[in-house]
Amino acid sequence: MKVIAILFLLAFVLCTMEITMVEAGFGCPLFQFACDSHCRGMGRKGGYCGGNFKLTCICVVK
């Protein structure tokens, strides 16, 4: 029963946290605020630097 509850919780979290990849750059990895500003300018909730060596700007969907 605990396994089912954990799997359900994991599925719920993954469904509520949609992210989309954006082109590399946009301030990453040194200026994460530039990535966040870029994503907000596209109407997203925000953004952060991720991927290998934090070189990719990842935007969080609303």
From Swiss-Prot:
Keywords associated with the record? Antibiotic, Antimicrobial, Calcium-activated potassium channel impairing toxin, Defensin, Disulfide bond, Immunity, Innate immunity, Ion channel impairing toxin, Potassium channel impairing toxin, Secreted, Signal, Toxin, Voltage-gated potassium channel impairing toxin
Function field: Antibacterial peptide active against Gram-positive bacteria, but not on Gram-negative bacteria. Also has weak blocking activity on Kv1.1/KCNA1, Kv1.2/KCNA2, Kv1.3/KCNA3, KCa3.1/KCNN4/IK, KCa2.3/KCNN3/SK3 and Kv11.1/KCNH2/ERG1 channels (tested at 1 uM). It inhibits potassium channel current by interacting with the pore region.
A GO molecular function assigned to this protein is: potassium channel regulator activity
| Disulfide cross-links | C28-C49, C35-C57, C39-C59
The name this protein carries in UniProt is: Defensin BmKDfsin6
Annotated coiled-coil segments of the chain: none
Tell me the compartments it is located in.
Secreted
Q: Which residues form the signal peptide?
A: 1-24
Q: Which Pfam families match?
A: Defensin_2
| One GO term (biological process) | innate immune response
Give the tissue specificity.
Answer: Highly expressed in non-venom gland (hemolymph) and moderately expressed in venom gland.
Q: Does the keyword Cytoplasm apply?
A: no
Cellular component per GO, a single term: extracellular region
The cross-references to InterPro entries, in alphabetical order and at most eight, read: Defensin_invertebrate/fungal, Scorpion_toxin-like_sf
Its family? Belongs to the invertebrate defensin family. Type 2 subfamily.
